[in-house]
Amino acid sequence: MNNVASPTLTVRRITTADNAAIARVIRQVSAEYGLTADKGYTVADPNLDELYQVYSQPGAAYWVVEQNGCVVGGGGVAPLSCSEPDICELQKMYFLPVIRGQGLAKKLALMALDHAREQGFKRCYLETTAFLREAIALYERLGFEHISEPLGCTGHVDCEVRMLKDL
């Protein structure tokens, strides 16, 4: 009988040392789905290489998923810019193919929503694209509802799917 070591998965808060690795994950997954910078997706965000600094702000948090010491995914939550103070945004949920289908996106989203509640947010907004069918299905299962108009000023002009959840 062969012994197969199962990969060690860890979900933890982002550190400054994770900036380059999570930016690579986001760029790789974005390229996989054709989510290019010219269309206003996350890869166009000027702070993509500084996520630790972004999510060190009040009310914000970001988690990375490590497999055997390598960053393979992440996601977070932050106050929604240009919006009511009780609305946060679920942001930058990206996972490499090697860890998809294991429930990590759900686990991370639930952690983010719990954090948002603890920070006093009453609603959580998100934007995504119809290309990400699995993500939309997850958000619907988590209680997010589709809304017609964007909230805040995210700059993600081609994210045509907008959702909101009461916390």
UniProtKB/Swiss-Prot annotation:
<keyword id="KW-0808">Transferase</keyword>
<dbReference type="GO" id="GO:0008080">
    <property type="term" value="F:N-acetyltransferase activity"/>
</dbReference>
<keyword id="KW-0012">Acyltransferase</keyword>
<dbReference type="Pfam" id="PF00583">
    <property type="entry name" value="Acetyltransf_1"/>
</dbReference>
<protein>
    <recommendedName>
        <fullName>Uncharacterized N-acetyltransferase YjgM</fullName>
        <ecNumber>2.3.1.-</ecNumber>
    </recommendedName>
</protein>
<dbReference type="InterPro" id="IPR016181">
    <property type="entry name" value="Acyl_CoA_acyltransferase"/>
</dbReference>
<comment type="similarity">
    <text>Belongs to the acetyltransferase family.</text>
</comment>
<dbReference type="InterPro" id="IPR050769">
    <property type="entry name" value="NAT_camello-type"/>
</dbReference>
<dbReference type="InterPro" id="IPR000182">
    <property type="entry name" value="GNAT_dom"/>
</dbReference>
<feature type="domain" description="N-acetyltransferase">
    <location>
        <begin position="9"/>
        <end position="167"/>
    </location>
</feature>
